[in-house]
Amino acid sequence: MRLPEKFEDRMKKMLGDEYDDFIKSMDETPIFTGIRINTSKVGAKDAVIKEFGELQNVPWCSDGFYANKSKISGNHPYHLAGLFYFQEPSAMSTVSALNIESDDYVLDLCAAPGGKATQAGAFIGKNGLLVANEIVKNRANILSDNIDRFGLTNAVVTNETPQKLAEKYVHFFDKIIVDAPCSGEGMFRKEPQAVDEWSVEHTVSCGVRQKHILDCAMKMLKGGGYIVYSTCTFAPEENEQVCAYMLENYNVELVEPNNLDMLSKGRGEWSNSKCDMSKTRRIFPHKNNGEGHFVALFHSLDNYESEVNKPKKTSMTDAEKVYRQFEKEFLNTELDGEFCLFGEQLYLKPKCIDVDKIKVVRNGLNLGIYRKNRFEPSYALCLTLKKEDFKNTVDFECDSEELKKYLMGNTVECDKKGWSAVTVNGYPIGWGKASNGILKNHFPKYLRLKR
């Protein structure tokens, strides 16, 4: 790989005797991909591991595995059912560093495409909250789709600037994830265009931007809360030097990140300060099976309280009444929460957050479409529930022709009546509506297989 001369010179100074091993690793093309199991779906880990054989565990993520690129694809039924997520193994370290509790309010400030948001969301229970933000609209839509497929309920997707969120949610979140936009040096092996875009000036400008994002994050953090900061670059200007800025400007401390003892420590001499960086962590491709990455965990030493008012409870609407009738007829479970209608889309929104004057892509769980006093359930609702939550299910084996026909958008034979969940080996993958021995296909058109 042809690397920028100034990049090589800097890495020589940083790594010393390790430089030759590092530069050799940059010429190696990884044959593995990373997958992370969706632990919120009961038994998913066993099912996926059985399907793909012996998988090597990612050392810093108990639910992450290395998989052979040639043996797994995004069209696999288990991926479409939200049982696993493709994610660079190094990127799994960011959320692993946090100890997320089920009732935490968590913000992922730079969340697309959704790897870290779905990883965090798997820990969050009915009393917790995930807000996943993405400033670019089309990327926010992709983020929302991935959260839908993962079956997360108490998750809101926003499309805002960090500044706008900071004005709205003052000292609101227990934990904040800042996987900051960066120069991408750690991804040179997988994304050659990042090499062409690299310059010393770019790394410096990224550092300025990252500090601004962290300024906004600090305004939203509760007293005693945690911010995990990460990048996929080797540049000290974006890593240790950004951490030094935090330590020098805020009442925070660096703490040992969870689950990352096996990784290299950051260096204080790279921070251009007297700050101790031994509690930060780095991933280097010549030392670990993963691309370049940096992680730091900050703990707030302040004790201020949240300044955010909770939203008022709304009264039952006609849309909710129609949904409750659908629920009574076709489900064995009753969802708890508050309902809101965005156009024709009916959402079950988290009770704890006010999104007034915020650009929202997903205001909680999308239940389905309410139109002319009728309700049509969503793909997101199906993937949130478990097989036992449905009154009607049509189960197919993972490698069956019937499942392939369904995923291509075709009708299949069925002895049920009305709305039915199609499941793959017991895991919901989409809806169908049965009548006269035929299951009409309601698998999302944008996900349907071509052949």
Q: What does each model-found stretch correspond to?
A:
Residues M1-K50, E291-F294, L301-R451:
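Polybasic, low-complexity RNA-engagement segments
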Residues T33-M92:
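Conserved AdoMet
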Residues D103-A112:
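Conserved class I S-adenosyl-L-methionine
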Residues P113-K126:
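Conserved SAM-binding loop of SAM-dependent methyltransferases across substrates and taxa
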Residues I124-G125, L221-G223:
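Helix-to-beta-strand junctions that scaffold the AdoMet/dcAdoMet cofactor pocket
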Residues N133-H171:
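S-adenosyl-L-methionine
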Residues N138, K175-C216, C232-E240, N258-D261, ...:
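Mobile active-site "lid"/loop adjacent to the S-adenosyl-L-methionine
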Residues F173, Y226-Y229, T233-L348:
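Class I S-adenosyl-L-methionine
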